[in-house]
Each structure stands twice: as C-alpha cells, then as structure tokens.
Design a protein with these regions (language model features):
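Glycan-processing catalytic domains of CAZymes
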Residues: 1-205, 210-241
Length: 241
C-alpha cells in the first residue's frame, strides 16, 4: 500500500511497520540463490533493513536460505554459499541469523545430521563469537571493494581500513562507537566459489580475532594484516587497544 519506486516504497513500509508494531527486533528473510543464477537485490534488501534498524535503534536478524524449493526456483545452498550469507549479514550489522528450511531442519534426529549440519554448527559458533565482540559497537558502514552491487556502497577514499592489494570482491563492514570513527572491521570474501588472500591496512597496529577460541592476536605486520579467507568467509580485525 506504499507508493513510489521499489526503494522508496519499501523504506516507507519499514517506517510504518516500526511505527505501528513497535517491534523489539526486525526479522526478515530474502532468498538469493536461484536454481541457475543468483538474485540481484540481496544487498539492496540487506542495506535497507540495516538503514531502518539503525534509524530505529533496533537489532535485526536475517533469516537465510538453507534449503531448495524447486517449485519456487530456488537451489539448495551449499556450505560456501551459507557461509557467504552468514558473513555478509554480519558485515552489514546483523545481530542474529536464522536458517530457513521447509522440512525437519538440518538433522532428523541426533543420529541423522545432514551434510550441512556440522559446517553450519561451526559457522553459527563463529557468527556468535564475532557478533558478541561487536555487540557494544555500532554499524558505521558496509562497503564493497571491486564491483558494487545494487544497493551497495563503494569504499570511501578516506576509509580508515583499506585493501592493499588490487581490487578484489571484498566487503568491509566497519564498526565503532556511535558517531565516532571505525575501530573494528569485518572483512568478507564475496567469492563463494573460491578462497582468497587479501591484505587490509589500518591507521595503527591491528589485531585479528580467532572466532573458535574467542581470542585476539597481534598482526605480524603491525598496521597491515594478511587474511586467508575461505569461499564466502570472513574475519574480524580491530585497532589495537
């Protein structure tokens, strides 16, 4: 019932929803992986939800695609594609993740996990660890290096965190205290088909977060860090305290 182009109408819909419903959390879903291609509005939807959540001072949760649906033209995402959905959501400031399936879930019972159960378990653990580190911080920007998708923003020239290597398909999610400069960045490999190595530089000594153990370590290059990222994977770095 809202008017305007797709973006304006959806922004107004979100504004009205928040005003009328007064939710404690914004939860939405967007299914990106089609049978033979990918959608073209995933980052647009993610950016608009992020914008609405920030304006309202609310956390948001992304319910991500975790199954196929032949009748609707969806393919079932593999491990790398689910990792891509998880880390792109995290870089845009999501506070939570849900996995949408039509059937019984990722396991029928404790003795019958499907092929995605253990990889997703590890990814959820890493999401929780990184999201916990970012809980007291604000999402200050989500920037695309290389090709900028519909709804995305290019990395500003004056960004505190930059890529040292030639342009790669990398997403930088910047976090810090509200109205301050970024101190943390989530670095995501946007290629879910192949691993990559990228070097990120910052304005001072950097530290890298090891999500499985929830520990920080000094970057060997002080104000630069080389990251080996799996397909669709990401890492959290910060300025040394």
């Amino acid at each position: 019932g809202t008017k305007g182009d797709t973006v304006a109408a959806y922004q107004e819909y979100l504004r009205r929803f928040i005003q009328v419903v007064k939710p404690g959390l914004i939860s939405y879903d967007h299914y990106h992986f089609r049978k033979t291609s990918d959608g073209d509005q995933y980052f647009l939807n993610l950016a608009l939800i992020r914008e609405a959540a920030l304006k309202a001072g609310l956390p948001f949760l992304n319910i991500i695609q975790a199954c196929d649906s032949p009748s609707e033209g969806w393919r079932g995402p593999n491990e790398h594609e689910i990792r891509w959905l998880i880390f792109t959501s995290l870089a845009y400031g999501a506070h939570g993740i849900g996995h949408f399936r039509y059937d019984v879930g990722l396991c029928k019972d404790a003795d019958s996990p499907n092929a995605l159960y253990w990889p997703v378990t590890r990814m959820n653990r890493d999401f929780l660890a990184i999201a916990t580190e970012l809980r007291s911080l604000a999402s200050l920007g989500a920037y695309h290096c290389g090709k900028v998708p519909t709804g995305g923003m290019a990395l500003p020239k004056d960004s505190r965190f930059k890529l040292e290597s030639p342009p790669q398909e990398i997403l930088l999610g910047c976090f810090g205290k509200p109205s301050r400069r970024p101190t943390h960045v989530v670095v995501v490999n946007l290629d879910y088909k192949g691993a990559t190595t990228t070097t990120v530089t910052g304005p001072g000594p950097l530290e890298v977060f090891h999500a499985p153990t929830r520990t920080w370590s000094k970057a060997s290059g002080r104000n630069r860090v080389e990251l080996d990222l799996p397909p669709g994977g990401g890492a959290l770095i910060r300025l040394k305290k």
